[in-house]
C-alpha cells in the first residue's frame, strides 16, 4: 500500500496533475502500473481518511494540551515509530513545521499503514502527504519539502 501512496504522491505532486481524478480511472491506471487491487483500495481508503482528517470530518484530536506537555507514545506507536522517527516528530514540532493537530494526523496516518517495516524516510513522506492539502500549512509543507529533498541531494554528492 505504501508503494501505491508514494507513486500517487510523486506522480501528482511533481507533475502538478489535478487531484480530482475519477476513482475508477485512477484504479485502472494503478493496475496498469502494476499495483495489486488490494493495495490500491487500501491506499485510496488511506487517502480518503486523510482527507477527512484534513477537512475536519475525521477523528477529532484533543488539542487543549499545554504547549509544554510531552507526547507519550503508546506501546504500539513506539514499536512502529522508532526513536529516530519520534525524535524527528519532536524536532518538527520545535521548529513549528508540525503543530499538535498535524502531528496527531501524521501519527494517525502512520499507524493506519500496513507496512511491515517503517523508517524515518517513510515518515518524512507521510508528513509531506499530510501537510500537502491542509489550508494554512503551505509554509510548513515547503519547509518539510526542503528538508526531504535537501537531504536527498546531499546523498547524491
Curated annotation (Swiss-Prot):
Similarity field: Belongs to the Smg family.
Gene source species: Sodalis glossinidius (strain morsitans)
NCBIfam families per record: PRK03430.1
UniProt name for this protein: Protein Smg
Pfam families in UniProt: DUF494
Amino acid at each position: 500500500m505504501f508503494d501505491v501512496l508514494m507513486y500517487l504522491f510523486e506522480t501528482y505532486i511533481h507533475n502538478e496533475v489535478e487531484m480530482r481524478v475519477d476513482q475508477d480511472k485512477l484504479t485502472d491506471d494503478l493496475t496498469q502500473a502494476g499495483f495489486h487491487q488490494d493495495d490500491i483500495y487500501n491506499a485510496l481508503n488511506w487517502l480518503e481518511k486523510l482527507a477527512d482528517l484534513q477537512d475536519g470530518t475525521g477523528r477529532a484530536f484533543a488539542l487543549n494540551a499545554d504547549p509544554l506537555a510531552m507526547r507519550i507514545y503508546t506501546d504500539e506507536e513506539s514499536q512502529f515509530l522508532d526513536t529516530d522517527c519520534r525524535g524527528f516528530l519532536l524536532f518538527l514540532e520545535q521548529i513549528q513545521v508540525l503543530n499538535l493537530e498535524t502531528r496527531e494526523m501524521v501519527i494517525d496516518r502512520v499507524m493506519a499503514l500496513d507496512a511491515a517495516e517503517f523508517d524515518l524516510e517513510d515518515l518524512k513522506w507521510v508528513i509531506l502527504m499530510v501537510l500537502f492539502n491542509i489550508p494554512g500549512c503551505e509554509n510548513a509543507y515547503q519547509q518539510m519539502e526542503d528538508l526531504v529533498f535537501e537531504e536527498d541531494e546531499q546523498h547524491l554528492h
